[in-house]
Amino acid sequence: MKQLLDFLPLIIFFTVYKLVDIYTATGALIAATAVQIAILYFVYKKVEKMHLVTFAMVTVFGTLTLAFHDDAFIKWKVTIIYSLFAIALAVSQIMNKSIIKAMLGKELKADDNIWARVTWYWALFFIGCGVLNVYVAFSLPLETWVNFKVFGLTALTLLNTVISVFYIYKHAQPEQDDTAN
């Protein structure tokens, strides 16, 4: 259910965009993200920082989009969120406190240099996606950007996740058997 909740605002944004327009879709995105946060809080009694940052950015840039009737704001939101993620990953790695290791290190055992590579890889991935978003958002038609945002970036993220998991598994330390004498 949690994975569905992660995609709920995106699905609603896309559907409303296709049925109405970018401005109504932006309002729906703000509302859907607020509902997502509320459900996460009431069901799981916890809301991750990533969701809160995303909600804040959606609210700020969505409101600017609606107030100025200018879709450039909602287009920039994607790049800014990805930039913040890249910065957070880079800073965490520089401080030797990899966010990715903190999230996955209990389930997957790997050397710190593997976690560092994966962390830098994701930081570069987010920078690349942010740059690509700017290109698509401001060089191609709105319809293309919406499709890219919903399907392209989602597919790229899933592909990147698969690549990362395979890389970590390839270099993972074998589980130690606690029952061995």
Swiss-Prot record:
Keyword Oxidoreductase among UniProt keywords: no
Q: Which UniProt keywords apply?
A: Cell inner membrane, Cell membrane, Membrane, Transmembrane, Transmembrane helix
* Membrane topology designation: Multi-pass membrane protein
Q: Which domain of life is it from?
A: Bacteria
Q: Which GO terms describe its cellular component?
A: plasma membrane
InterPro entries from the entry?
Answer: YciB
Transmembrane ranges?
22-42, 50-70, 72-92, 118-138, 148-168
> Where, subcellularly, is it found?
Cell inner membrane
Q: Which family does it belong to?
A: Belongs to the YciB family.
The record's listing under PANTHER family reads:
INNER MEMBRANE-SPANNING PROTEIN YCIB, INTRACELLULAR SEPTATION PROTEIN A-RELATED
NCBIfam families membership: ispZ, PRK00259.1-2, PRK00259.1-3
State the protein's purpose. Plays a role in cell envelope biogenesis, maintenance of cell envelope integrity and membrane homeostasis.
State the HAMAP family in the record: YciB (MF_00189)
Record's protein name: Inner membrane-spanning protein YciB
Originating organism: Shewanella denitrificans (strain OS217 / ATCC BAA-1090 / DSM 15013)
What is this protein's gene name? yciB
